[in-house]
């Protein structure tokens, strides 16, 4: 009798132990795996405005169709500064960023050389450069690289200057020149809403012929401002409206 009781008691303990082990195994398999919290990436979409400034350089030349003479090529250089407005659209779930941008820059890019008449110096000066471009970029969270291209316009004049005095003997007056621009840059969103950029732009402007007059308005001759190239490197600061975290998640 005692043997039967002992056997039943041992059997009961074994059953309880097996049940506990099975329950523990179930708990172990059903415990949720730990997942790191999602990291939200920067969203570049939205309207932005900014300021920019830098320096430009290039080569220019002039042609005088009346006497059929021309200057040699001469260097031009100077500062640029202005503003920018644009809009970015980052494709959902992607790092690609597309945009439109307008730049409105004041400039002081100028240079001189000896005229065909060596009594005078000939030169040109750009005082404005404006552009309307499309942009395409690729973003790594807060950092974006981009390329741009589109229409460019400059306000320029040719001058004939009296050496030693700086007096303008005759000039074409300010005239607009059409062209195009290609550029590339790097932009960094250092805090929400604010980004800094560095950018290189190449400009090509078409040639244009204008009448050169004395300060009193008396016609002297025609001057052709030949087609020209300008290079500009600038830095800028942009403010982005309605910045918000992107639904794009960081990958582990």
How should these model regions be labeled?
Residues 2-252:
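Gram-negative outer-membrane beta-barrel domains
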């Amino acid at each position: 009798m005692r043997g039967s009781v002992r056997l039943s008691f041992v059997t009961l303990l074994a059953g309880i132990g097996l049940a506990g082990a099975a329950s523990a195994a179930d708990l172990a398999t059903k415990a949720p795996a730990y997942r790191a919290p999602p990291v939200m990436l920067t969203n570049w979409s939205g309207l932005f405005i900014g300021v920019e400034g830098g320096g430009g350089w290039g080569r220019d030349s002039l042609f005088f169709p009346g006497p059929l003479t021309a200057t040699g090529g001469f260097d031009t250089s100077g500062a640029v500064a202005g503003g920018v407005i644009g809009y970015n659209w980052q494709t959902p779930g992607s790092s690609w960023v597309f945009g439109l941008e307008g730049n409105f820059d004041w400039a002081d890019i100028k240079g001189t050389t000896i005229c065909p008449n060596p009594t005078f110096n000939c030169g040109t000066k750009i005082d404005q450069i404006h552009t309307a471009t499309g942009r395409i970029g690729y973003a790594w969270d807060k950092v974006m690289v981009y390329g741009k291209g589109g229409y460019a316009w400059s306000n320029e004049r040719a001058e004939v200057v009296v050496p030693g005095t700086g007096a303008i003997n005759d000039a074409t007056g300010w005239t607009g020149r059409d062209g195009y621009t290609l550029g590339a840059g790097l932009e960094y969103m250092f805090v929400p809403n604010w980004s800094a950029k560095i950018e290189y732009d190449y400009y090509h402007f078409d040639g244009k012929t204008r009448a050169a007059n004395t300060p009193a308005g008396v016609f002297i001759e025609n001057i052709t401002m030949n087609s020209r190239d300008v290079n500009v490197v600038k830095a800028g600061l942009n403010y982005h409206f309605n910045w918000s975290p992107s639904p794009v998640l960081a990958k582990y």
